[in-house]
Every structure is written in structure tokens, then in C-alpha cells.
From Swiss-Prot:
Cited PANTHER family: ALKYL HYDROPEROXIDE REDUCTASE AHPD, BLR3452 PROTEIN
Coiled coil region boundaries: none
GO molecular function annotation: oxidoreductase activity; peroxiredoxin activity
Native organism taxonomy: Archaea, Methanobacteriati, Methanobacteriota, Methanomada group, Methanococci
Protein name: Uncharacterized protein MJ1511
Amino acid sequence: MAEFVPAETIEVVKKNCPEFYEAVANLQKEVFSGKKLDEKMQRLVLLAVVATLGDEKAVKRQTKKLMEMGATIEEIQDVMKVVYIGAGMPRFIKAVEAILEVAGDQC
């Protein structure tokens, strides 16, 4: 399971290894600049991936970002249906609980 990298760690890398930091930052920009899928759709795919992996922190981050981008609860629910089929009930429940922490009563 992917682990969340604390902001302090990122700042240390940025200060001590600026070239490496830039490469990673540029890669993230490149990843979300799809030619056929817009950033919101790519992040919906990423939400499915991190939910399937059971990474609750990443589910919360992606849900928050998606909501900021205007994703609807219905779109997020559609993703969770796919997660249920692909990952099973335990991972589905874990992801839904994380989403509820971010979205509250909107679900």
C-alpha cells in the first residue's frame, strides 16, 4: 500500500535535492495533462486505484481534490461501484468511510 509522504519530507527533498524534486513535480504535471482524458477523469481513475489498494489517506486526498474540481457525488459513487466489483467489500467499505469523512452528508 502506498504511504503518504509528510510535507516536511517533501520540503527536505526540495531543499536538498532540488533537481530530483523538480523532476517529480514535472512528472505529476505531465501525468495529469492527458490528451484524451481530462484531469478530473484521470483523478477519478486514480481514486479507484487508491481505493482498491486500501490507501485511506489517498482516498481522502483524491476525494477532496475531485470535489474542489467540481466532481459530483454521483461520479464518485460510480467509481466506488467499480471498486466494489474489483476489490471486494472490505476495501469498498474502507474507501466509502474515507469518502464520508471528506464529503460528509453529501453522499
